[in-house]
Amino acid sequence: KNMYGIHVSDNNVDVVDAVDVLVLAVKPQYYESVITQIKDHVRADQLIITIAPGKTLSWLAEKFGKDVKIVRTMPNTPALVGEGMTGATPNEFVTEAEIKYVCEILSGFSKVEVISEKLMDTVVAVSGSSPAYVFMFIEAMADAAVEQGMPRAQAYKFAVQAVMGSAKMVLETGKHPGELKDMVCSPAGTTIKAVRVLEKE
């Protein structure tokens, strides 16, 4: 509390009355009950940031029952280590300056892209769920290394660094992932043979 100036309350209405930016970070199944509690206290000048898959801007507007400034967002779990990716969609009442401010808040733990709402489900697939796929990929590569005799801890180091380095190459070179893949694949080499197996399977 002393270091960051954080105030804690177990009363949702007290929180709404005290803030200019309200983050609704509860499980989707609790959204309606929380909105019912607070909607009469939400001000027209407040910014509301939501974090809940499936809760559309139109659904939220209906539940609040009045014109409110809402930015719908979808971060992913790498935000826990400051490397997240967040999609953000403002409604028609949010100004350009306000969406810029929201992006500044979100950039504290992730990269941010402002998107149209029709792409939010795509964000869930390509960013929200995909860390699980990457974790499975890392585990599979490490398992293969362990099978060949490498200690588990060392296998994870190799697999994780390969993923981190490869991702950085895509970001920093600007090259198409397919082009970068081709750079690794020597004619008749082991990599292209492995790629062919992955493509078939």
Predicted regions and their residues:
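Internal alpha-helical scaffold of NAD(P)-dependent oxidoreductase catalytic cores
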Residues: 59-69, 85-123, 135-172
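NAD(P)-dependent Rossmann-like dehydrogenase/reductase catalytic/cofactor-binding core
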Residues: 160-201
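Short pre-catalytic strand/loop immediately N-terminal to key active-site residues, enriched for Gly-Thr
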Residues: 71, 120-125, 177-182
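Glycine-rich beta-alpha junction loops
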Residues: 53-55, 75-79, 127, 161-163, ...
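Rossmann-like NAD(P)(H) cofactor-binding subdomain of soluble oxidoreductases
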Residues: 4, 11-88, 92
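Short acidic-hydrophobic, aromatic-tinged amphipathic segments that line or gate anion-handling sites
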Residues: 7-12, 113-115
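Conserved SAM-binding loop
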Residues: 1
